[in-house]
């Protein structure tokens, strides 16, 4: 019992010393995200859904891009994404595809609703590496029924 009490006291002191909200740039306000409009008549509970984004990156920026993508990985996983990965196209150098899976179409829409301003800042840093006039190509793949 004494050990538990000591642990609680030390935990309380630690929380006061190292607060999670000390980052002055941390902005957890929700960000407006445009929801994709499916061309298929899809039920919200249909899934799983594989989401992918295709980026065109200069080879000289590949290493820095992958470092930024680790922050994007945390955003996707925090939002409920699993099986996150980035692949490089061996037939078209400079094409990188980010991919992750969510349980259903509704889960992905909810993921977008939880997108914060901090998430948007990370996404903007990642997209700064993208070397095309259009935004990265997004694909939403659902398992056939």
Place the predicted regions along the sequence by residue.
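An amphipathic, aromatic/His-enriched active-site/gating alpha helix that lines ligand/cofactor pockets
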Residues: 23, 74-84, 101-137
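Short, highly charged
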Residues: 61-90, 94-100
């Amino acid at each position: 019992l004494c050990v538990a009490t000591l642990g609680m006291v030390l935990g309380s002191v630690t929380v006061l010393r190292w607060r999670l909200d000390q980052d002055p740039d941390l902005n957890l306000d929700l960000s407006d995200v445009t929801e994709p409009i499916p061309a298929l008549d899809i039920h919200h509970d249909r899934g799983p859904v594989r989401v992918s984004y295709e980026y065109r990156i200069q080879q000289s920026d590949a290493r820095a891009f992958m470092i930024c993508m680790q922050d994007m990985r945390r955003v996707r996983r925090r939002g409920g994404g699993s099986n996150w990965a980035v692949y490089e196209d061996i037939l078209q150098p400079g094409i990188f595809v980010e991919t992750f899976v969510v349980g259903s179409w509704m889960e992905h829409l909810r993921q977008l609703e939880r997108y914060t301003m901090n998430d948007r800042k990370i996404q903007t840093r990642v997209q700064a590496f993208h070397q095309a006039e259009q935004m990265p190509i997004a694909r939403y793949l659902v398992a056939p029924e």
